[in-house]
Structures are given as structure tokens and as C-alpha cells.
Design a protein with these regions (language model features):
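Carbohydrate-interacting regions of secretory-pathway proteins
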Residues: 20-216
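Bacterial Sec-dependent N-terminal signal peptides
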Residues: 1-25
Length: 216
């Protein structure tokens, strides 16, 4: 039994190592934001302001909007950093997202939650199904099992936070500051846009930096 367990662990380690090596060897990280201007980005909405200040994207608005990258992607690893403003604030990273005819965006969103609810790193379906993980209401058996303290405490409220999103096929994973917060399968959208959100709080400035992608 011990031999079988050792063999299994060796095979598993080999597969995981080979996967990481394969990704790094055959692919290349690409900066979606060059740190100087917003080349490659666009605002599909009729409202919302966006600027680059000292290598940081700053979003300002009095209504919710998303600043979207021009290219659609399917399987990838996305890494980015976000800093929420003080006070009431909420944001997110759209991925594999879609656009309606009026320009509004919808689809998968990695949640950035500035409230005491502490759902940062959850998976939200913006403009469509709503919460996928965790689930409403806040107190329920699913959340008790799948949204434990480590995930709740991963986000640093008044600091920069690192997000990692991995999509391959229907497998979706999200990390916040190195803590895996979402790991599930959903096949609703296989390809779409990357976008960053201002939630619409007047006078609030949302900041993003170090946005890069590795296509799988």
C-alpha cells in the first residue's frame, strides 16, 4: 500500500511539474497594460473617465462602467493588482465577458468586495445569473462548507491586492494574494473580453496595475 501511495504521489508531482514547465516553455506573458497609456483598451460606455498616473490605471465615474481590453481570449492565466478607494467600494475583473448591442458588458467576474461581507475572490456573473460562488444569502450550508475563513480574509482592504485568474476549458480558478478562493467548472462562456470595473461611487478613484496574461 505504501509503495502504491509513493508511486501515485510521484506521478502526480511529475504531471503538475510538467504542466507548469509546459506553460512557461511554450507560452509568454504579455502585458495588457504598458504602464504608460491605455493602448489596446477601450470604454464601450458613454460615461466613465480613465487615466494613467505613475504607472497606474485610474477609473473615475458616477455610474458603473467597465474599461475593456480590445482582444478576446479563451484559455489563459491573468494576473493583476487592484487598490480600492476608502469608504464604500466594489469592483471586479471581468473575463471571457460579452458585450450587448448598447455596449454594456456582462459575464464572469472575479469579485473585489470592499464590504464586511468579504466575498473578494468569489465568482459573480455580471448582468446575468448573479452569484455563482459563494451563494446568496450570506448564511447558508453551501457557504459554510465552501467559503471558509481563509478565503474571507485573503483580501487586504486598504492596500494593493494581487489577483490571479486561470481559465482552461470549463475549469475556472481564482486566487487573491496567493489564496485560492474559487475552483469550479462552468461552461457558459468559452471566450470573451478582459475588463476592469468602476462600480459607480461618485468621486471614488479605483486603481489597477501590473495587468498581464499568459495564453494557455
Amino acid at each position: 500500500m505504501k509503495i502504491i501511495s509513493t508511486t501515485f504521489l510521484s506521478i502526480l508531482l511529475f504531471v503538475l511539474t510538467n504542466q507548469v514547465f509546459s506553460e512557461s516553455k511554450n507560452s509568454k506573458w504579455v502585458n495588457l497594460f504598458n504602464g504608460k497609456d491605455l493602448s489596446g483598451w477601450h470604454n464601450p460606455y458613454s460615461h466613465g473617465e480613465f487615466n494613467v498616473v505613475k504607472g497606474v490605471i485610474e477609473l473615475v465615474a458616477d455610474k458603473k462602467f467597465f474599461l475593456a481590453h480590445d482582444n478576446q481570449v479563451s484559455d489563459f492565466i491573468l494576473q493583476a493588482e487592484i487598490k480600492l478607494p476608502l469608504g464604500k467600494a466594489n469592483s471586479g475583473f471581468l473575463f471571457r465577458s460579452q458585450k450587448r448591442e448598447n455596449g454594456s458588458m456582462f459575464g464572469y467576474q472575479a469579485e473585489v468586495d470592499g464590504s464586511d461581507r468579504k466575498w473578494s475572490g468569489g465568482l459573480y456573473d455580471e448582468g446575468r445569473r448573479g452569484w455563482i460562488h459563494p451563494k446568496k444569502p450570506i448564511e447558508n450550508s453551501y457557504n459554510k462548507k465552501n467559503w471558509k475563513t481563509e478565503r474571507q480574509e485573503a483580501f487586504k482592504r486598504n492596500d494593493w491586492n494581487h489577483y490571479k485568474i486561470r481559465c482552461q476549458g470549463e475549469h475556472i480558478q481564482i486566487w487573491v494574494n496567493g489564496v485560492k478562493t474559487t475552483d469550479l467548472k462552468d461552461s457558459t462562456d468559452a471566450k470573451g473580453f478582459i475588463a476592469i470595473q468602476h462600480h459607480g461611487e461618485k468621486g471614488q478613484v479605483y486603481r489597477f496595475r501590473n495587468i498581464k496574461i499568459l495564453k494557455l
